[in-house]
A protein has these predicted regions:
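Secreted peptidase-domain scaffold signal
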Residues: 254, 269-312, 318, 584-595
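Active-site core segment of subtilase-fold serine proteases
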Residues: 121-173, 177, 190, 322-416, ...
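Autoinhibitory propeptides
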Residues: 38-113, 123-134, 437, 454
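Subtilisin-like serine protease catalytic core
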Residues: 102-209, 224, 254-256, 270-271, ...
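Hydrolase catalytic cores
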Residues: 176-179, 184, 198-209, 214-223, ...
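C-terminal subdomain of the subtilisin-like protease fold in secreted/lumenal serine endopeptidases
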Residues: 222-235, 239-244, 256-263, 269-272, ...
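C-terminal outer-membrane/trafficking sorting elements
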Residues: 596-653
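Catalytic-core environment of secreted peptidases
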Residues: 144-160, 317-321, 347, 361-362, ...
C-alpha cells in the first residue's frame, strides 16, 4: 500500500499505471526547520502563517515553513548535510555472534526493528528479500520536504510501483545492506539478517532525518519490538557541543531507540580553526578555498562560533595569491544578534577593474538560545574569474580575519562539502574537531572507521577481479572524523570496520550509471568506504544485543560499548580512534552478564527431565521453578539455572 500524506492542503491521485500528484500551480514551496516553541500562542501564529508542523518532542518542533519570495541567486542558509562485510565480520571474531559461538546460540536481530534515515533505497534488491521472495523492509517512508509531501509505503506491491526515492543515489541501499541485508546467497551478508527493516528517505534535511527517526520508532511501537536506528549522514557546521536543536531532539528520541550516527569522513581535511585570543595573538585569519582546489567558484557556508554571547569582530578581505598580500579590505563588522548584511558584486565592477569577485555573500549574526554562544555565518555564491598567471587556480581569494579580547575564543567551521579553510598569516586550519555536528549529542553513538580491506572485488569484462584499495587492514584511517568537544567528551564513541565494505548497490542507480564499476553477482554490489559503512555495522550488532536482552536502554548500550571497546591495536593514541575499537562479541557477553565468566555449562542436556530447577534471567529475576522438562516451553536465550546447590548458565535452543 502507498500512502501519500500532503502535510497541508494538497491533493493526490493514485492510479494503477503510476502515481500522479495534483498540486495547485500556486502551491507554496517549503523550507524545513527545527524550532523551539514557547507557548500556545506561538503555535497558533505559525499555523495561521501556513507553517506545517510534522512532529514534536517537548517544545521542539519539526516544521515546514513556506518560502518567502527571494532572489534566485540568494545563497541558502540551510545546513549542508551529506551521506557520509564478508571480511568486516572477521574482526574480533564478530561472526561468532551469528554462528552461535559467542553465546551458545546465534543472534541475528530476530525480534528487533532496525531502521535507516538516508537517501537512495532499492527496497526490492535481493539482499532484502526473505526465503519467500518478500521484502524484509516492512515500511518505506519518503519525505519531499520542499514540496510538503510525506509518502508511506507498506509492502512489495507498493515498492514495485514506487521503485526508489532517487535513481541517482544508492547510499541508503548500501548502508541498509550492511545493517541487515541477507546477502542473497553471496558472501556479502549484513549483520542483523533476521531483523525487521524500516527505511526512511528524504532530501537529508535535519527535519527529514528526524521525522524518519519518529517513523521508525512508531513502527517499532506498533509491533512491540525494540529499535536500533542508523543515520549515516553528517554536517560540518554547527556548535559541535551537543546543544543544537537536532542533537537535543535526537537525545530525546534515544528514550525509544538506540541511535548510531557516522562520525564523518573529514578526519584529514582542514575545515576547522580553534583559536584563543591573547595579547600576542589578538586575531586569527584564514582564506576560503573550495573543494575543487581552484577557488574559481566559491559556494557554501562558514560559521565562526564565539565561546560566549559577545560577538567577535570580523574583517572581510580579498587576498591576491600572486602577490601574496591583501588586495582589498571590504570592512570590519561586529554582527549583533539578528544583524544581517548582504554584499553583491556584479560583472560590470569586475570588467572595470573595480573589484575582482562576481556574485553574492550574506553575513549574519546570532546568539544561540540553546547555548548562549554568538556565531557569525557567511553564506556565499561568487566567482573569482581571473586566473593566477600560468596556474590552474584563481588569483583572488576571499579572506577573513576574526578578532576578540584576550581570553575569548573562536571556533571556525567550514561546511566541508563545498568549502575548506586555507591558512593565512600563520594560522593553521586542522581536522582536530572534524566530528560531524549531528553526532555530538550525549545519548547517541558516534561511529568512526578503521581499515579492513586491502583488496576489493569488482566485475571487469565479465570476470571478477580484485582491485587494490588505499587502506591497510586493521589500521587507523586518517579520513575518519574525530574531536574532543568543549565539555571534554572524546569522539567518536567507537570505531568499526568501514574501509571498505562490500554491500548492496541500487539497481536503479546501476542502470543510470552503467559505465561505473561494480560487482555483478546477478544483482549489483559495491565496495564502498566511509564512516557511513562503519555506522550500520555497529548498529547491526547492537540489534543482536537487543535480541539477546530486549530491555537494554540507550544508556546501557553506551556503557557496554565504553566498557568493552578495544585499545590493543596499533596507534591506539591516534585521536582518529576516539574511545576505542568496537568489539561486538565482548559487548554481547557483557549485555548477557557474562563479565568474563567462561566456566558455565552451555547445554541443557546436563539436566535430567525431573530435576528440580530454578531459572533466573541474566538480570537476576526468577522466572521459573519446577521440573527441568518444563524448560522446553521457554523462549530461546541465556539463563542462570539453579540445580540443587549448583548454579550453571544454560543456553536454551
Amino acid at each position: 500500500m502507498i500512502r501519500y500524506k500532503f502535510v497541508g492542503l494538497l491533493t493526490c491521485l493514485i492510479m494503477s499505471a503510476g502515481i500522479f500528484c495534483a498540486v495547485a500551480d500556486d502551491a507554496a514551496a517549503f523550507e524545513p526547520k527545527i524550532i523551539r516553541i514557547h507557548d500556545e500562542s506561538e503555535l497558533h501564529s505559525l499555523e495561521e502563517a501556513g507553517v506545517r508542523l510534522l512532529r514534536h518532542r517537548g517544545d521542539i518542533y519539526l516544521c515546514l515553513f513556506p518560502l518567502q519570495e527571494r532572489m534566485a541567486t540568494s545563497p541558502s542558509r540551510i545546513r549542508r548535510i551529506t551521506p557520509s562485510l564478508d571480511v568486516a565480520k572477521t574482526y574480533y571474531d564478530a561472526f561468532a555472534i551469528q554462528e552461535g559461538r559467542a553465546a551458545g546460540i546465534p543472534y541475528t536481530g530476530n525480534g528487533v526493528v532496525v531502521g535507516i534515515c538516508d537517501i537512495g533505497i532499492d527496497p526490492l534488491h535481493p539482499t532484502f528479500l526473505d526465503a519467500d521472495g518478500k521484502s524484509r523492509i516492512k515500511r518505506v517512508v519518503q519525505y519531499k520536504e520542499k514540496e510538503g509531501i510525506r509518502i508511506q509505503l507498506d509492502g512489495d506491491d507498493a515498492y514495485q510501483e514506487w521503485k526508489t526515492d532517487d535513481t541517482d543515489k544508492y547510499h541508503a541501499t548500501h548502508v541498509c545492506g550492511i545493517l541487515a541485508g541477507s546477502g542473497a546467497g553471496t558472501p556479502y551478508s549484513g549483520i542483523a539478517t533476521d531483523a525487521e527493516i524500516v527505511a526512511t528517505v528524504s532530501t537529508l534535511s535535519e527535519v527529514g532525518l528526524l521525522a524518519g527517526v519518529e517513523d521508525i520508532i512508531d513502527y517499532a511501537r506498533e509491533v512491540g519490538k525494540p529499535a536500533v536506528i542508523n543515520i549515516s549522514v553528517g554536517c560540518n557546521t554547527g556548535p559541535h557541543d551537543g546543544t543544537s536543536l537536532f542533537s537535543q531532539y535526537l537525545d530525546m528520541c534515544a528514550d525509544d531507540a538506540v541511535i548510531v550516527l557516522s562520525a564523518g569522513n573529514e578526519g584529514s581535511h582542514n575545515n576547522t580553526i580553534m583559536h584563543t585570543f591573547s595579547e600576542a595573538a589578538p586575531s586569527v585569519s584564514f582564506r576560503l578555498g573550495n573543494t575543487a582546489w581552484d577557488e574559481f567558484h566559491m559556494y557554501g557556508a562558514t560559521e565562526m562560533w564565539s565561546g560566549s554571547s559577545r560577538p567577535l569582530s570580523v574583517i572581510l578581505k580579498v587576498y591576491d595569491s600572486v602577490e601574496r598580500r591583501i588586495a582589498f579590505e571590504i570592512g570590519e563588522f561586529t554582527m549583533a544578534d539578528g544583524d544581517e548584511i548582504s554584499f553583491s558584486w556584479d560583472e560590470s565592477d569586475f570588467s572595470a577593474g573595480l573589484f575582482p569577485l562576481v556574485g553574492e555573500l550574506v553575513m549574519s549574526g546570532e546568539v544561540s538560545p540553546e547555548n548562549g554562544r554568538h556565531f557569525t555565518t557567511l553564506a556565499y555564491d561568487f566567482q573569482s574569474p581571473e586566473p593566477a598567471e600560468g596556474k590552474g587556480w584563481a588569483r583572488y581569494e576571499f579572506a577573513v580575519e576574526v578578532a576578540g579580547k584576550p581570553g575569548e575564543d573562536v571556533e571556525v567551521y567550514a561546511d566541508g562539502t563545498y568549502t575548506r579553510l586555507v591558512g593565512l598569516a600563520g594560522s593553521r586550519p586542522s581536522p582536530e574537531r572534524s566530528i560531524s555536528d549531528l553526532a555530538c549529542g550525549r545519548r547517541v553513538i558516534s561511529a568512526g572507521m578503521y581499515g579492513n580491506r586491502s583488496l576489493s572485488p569488482e566485475t571487469s569484462d565479465g570476470e571478477i577481479i580484485e582491485v587494490p584499495t588505499r587502506y591497510e587492514e586493521a589500521a587507523t584511517v586518517v579520513h575518519s572524523s574525530y574531536g574532543t568537544l568543549r565539555d571534554g567528551r572524546v569522539t567518536p564513541l567507537t570505531v568499526a570496520p568501514g574501509a571498505p565494505v562490500v554491500s548492496a548497490y541500487s539497481r536503479y542507480y546501476r542502470d543510470l550509471h552503467a559505465d561505473e564499476p561494480y560487482l555483478d553477482l546477478g544483482s549489483p554490489w559495491l565496495s564502498e568506504s566511509g564512516t557511513s559503512m562503519a555506522s550500520p555495522y555497529i548498529a547491526g550488532y547492537i540489534a543482536t544485543w537487543l535480541e539477546a536482552v530486549p530491555g537494554l536502554t540507550t544508556d546501557d548500550v553506551i556503557r557496554i560499548i565504553l566498557d568493552t571497546n578495544r585499545t590493543d591495536f596499533a596507534d591506539n593514541s591516534d585521536p582518529h580512534n576516539g574511545m576505542g575499537w568496537f568489539d561486538p562479541v565482548a559487548g554481547l557477553r557483557r549485555a548477557l552478564g557474562w563479565n568474563g565468566v567462561d566456566s558455565a555449562a552451555d547445554s541443557i542436556g546436563m539436566l535430567s527431565p525431573d530435576d528440580y530447577v530454578e531459572v533466573y534471567s541474566m538480570t537476576g529475576a526468577k522466572i521459573y521453578a519446577g521440573a527441568a522438562k518444563g524448560l522446553s516451553g521457554m523462549s530461546k536465550g541465556l539463563y542462570v539455572v539453579r540445580l540443587a546447590s549448583s548454579v550453571m548458565k544454560v543456553a536454551l535452543p
